[in-house]
């Protein structure tokens, strides 16, 4: 069922995920480099961003004591050097929604995958799969180069460092012995101004129409990396205007647009992204928490609170229908741990059976990637077919039938399917992006048949 004849463009966010597996010796050496009282004092202060090594050590120790996953932004670009000297990375893999989606689709061997990120240093370019193309302008003409050959010297690099820790590890902080109560991970995510400008660069922008002629669909993501203000006087509004121009260029070439939404903590920035981008696209991918975030911005606070608190399928369906109507795009795709959902209007040309098949392709592709760690060829998809649907499948179906009896859904097509869930996944990062990419790909395929 893989639509190998389709071509996809993906932008804007790609980064390196550098994995560090923490052991007792590494943790102890880190702590010993500082006065234990200073570490304790900094833990009390609870730094919300990392500016210097002591900030990192304090937040890491705090996370290890609790045994709960955490993420803290790194705001000092000079700290890159300290991290690279201090740690040996177990693995460097491609991260960022646009990067993950490009590599997944390239693994399926579809006709063409064009990836675009405004920053392409060599270290990042080398993590993309063979077959992924990058647009460049040479002698005034648009060309598509293998992405590994298109890197630019001096481009800024975004590295998210993921520190994995195991339950039971012990270390000392002064006189105190600490045992880690649970396994988990501590993420240090790069948040420098130099890598937060989400845009199509000036050399490529005039050629977006030409790129649009080469593809059937485009998947945009990464808006959550924007800042409200920049040191040169630009702001989020400037970059969102440019992003909207990109979308309109593709739409004029009849390219279907999917946006993979992501949580944005800053409420004002979230509102700007929702109101400036989502009404102009065809398809939006979100999870339950993001349904609530969008509803809150649209003024449906009570329903948003219900979704955050109770997590009921019925509320998510109602919220999804409201989002679809308020923002007036074509189809909403919701991915959660236990179910996937499409909500679209009744006049959508796809039947409910075709919509269900599209979602099934998405969850099967994600199950294959979770099982194998990567999609290296079209046959890898079949591995996902062997993964059973999750243990709550019957419960999901029952709740969906109840929701149908309570909600007025006559004007909509709503399809809910259970997910395939891998018990011991090799990989968990980016599975929502994988589902969205697979579902959007097959959605395009069914649309073409109509």
Curated annotation (Swiss-Prot):
Annotated PROSITE patterns: ADPK
Localization, UniProt: Cytoplasm
Function: Catalyzes the phosphorylation of fructose 6-phosphate to fructose 1,6-bisphosphate using ADP as the phosphate donor.
Coiled-coil intervals, chain numbering: none
Chief location category: cytoplasm
A GO MF label: ADP-specific phosphofructokinase activity
Catalytic class of the enzyme: transferase
Keywords carried by this UniProt record: Cytoplasm, Glycolysis, Kinase, Magnesium, Metal-binding, Transferase
Cellular component per GO, a single term: cytoplasm
Pathway per the UniProt entry: Carbohydrate degradation; glycolysis
Similarity comment: Belongs to the carbohydrate kinase PfkC family.
Protein name in UniProt: ADP-specific phosphofructokinase
Positions annotated as active site in the UniProt record: 433
Catalytic activity reported: beta-D-fructose 6-phosphate + ADP = beta-D-fructose 1,6-bisphosphate + AMP + H(+)
EC numbers, comma separated: 2.7.1.146
GO aspect biological process, one term: glycolytic process
Protein's UniProt keywords contain Kinase: yes
A Pfam entry, by short name: ADP_PFK_GK
